[in-house]
């Protein structure tokens, strides 16, 4: 039997009213009836609070990492709270511009930016392009020489050689990675010199990102020291220290908060003699625990002495993290939040994959049944953004809740949406 629901995993405005969970003043069961399932539900006050924390912690220099969760409404919320935003593809850039996000507050990332993406970014007037390779420098030089585009304000992405102590698929700071210029080989120094000497680029600073779901502040401090020591001799004033702050997903996990993370990064850089702007790119730390996903149970299969399967109407197409990273999640019944969670279940999706598991081992009240709405918390990051149409399953809608009101910000995908691209 599991203990009571760990409330630190829930959105900030979560309350129990007559045994039912209410977020943003909205009953989750009623939201499931109104919008259907699966559905992503975001606590808008939680989102704004984390944006405000990041802005305060980094002195207004925080940049939201759009890849964690991006839609027009989220881009506008980020803008209204005074953060910049980092985008890493032409699609993310287009979404930001469509939302009316000021281009000079955008940072354009990507390890393999195409010429068309670079043209789009430069013509839009993005604030910074984070240069990731010598091939990218060649492309920028070419666009300047042949089309007169530029010069471009750039940050040089370096690979500091830091172990982030996280899953190998989201570790990016070690030497063996596709990202950036490696410090240990001298490539980082070479890249900075080239950028400073090139007429097509204005070298503004250095960027590093060591990975995602990082809980050890010392890993961040180590990266910050390396970035600072590389930047200072070249007179580069801006330091962008990436994102990656971990968040708890299951009971028993804990993580530093945004203020503690900022203190570690900024304090380290100041101690090294950095006097210029220090930026960071929180994504998951802002959106992950702001949301939960509601599903409806369709089938219960009990194998005596083995396990009980709860099959729901979503799965790996709306949350691929368990399949990709072995990520764990909690589960609960919004209609019975305070009830003892005495029945162990494995929550699976509707896809034709044995690995389509959302929760490998979760606990629910013993009376869970077909038709019940269940919820998985901490799904605000890399669920909607990494979702797919696997097996032609339509993508779920996204709903923002605040002050007792709900609003649809991304509608449920329909079959007709998938047919629109077909030309055969």
State the predicted function of each range.
Residues 27, 31, 43-46, 50, ...:
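General structural feature for long, well-ordered alpha-helical segments within catalytic domains
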Residues 275-424:
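Charged (often Lys/Glu-rich) extended helix/loop segments that serve as interaction or gating elements
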Residues 61-63, 82-84, 103-107, 128, ...:
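Structural preference for beta-strand elements that scaffold enzyme active sites
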Residues 1-153, 189, 193-203, 404-424:
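A charged N-terminal "starter" segment
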Residues 46, 67-71, 88-91, 111-113, ...:
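Active-site beta-loop-alpha junctions enriched in small/polar residues
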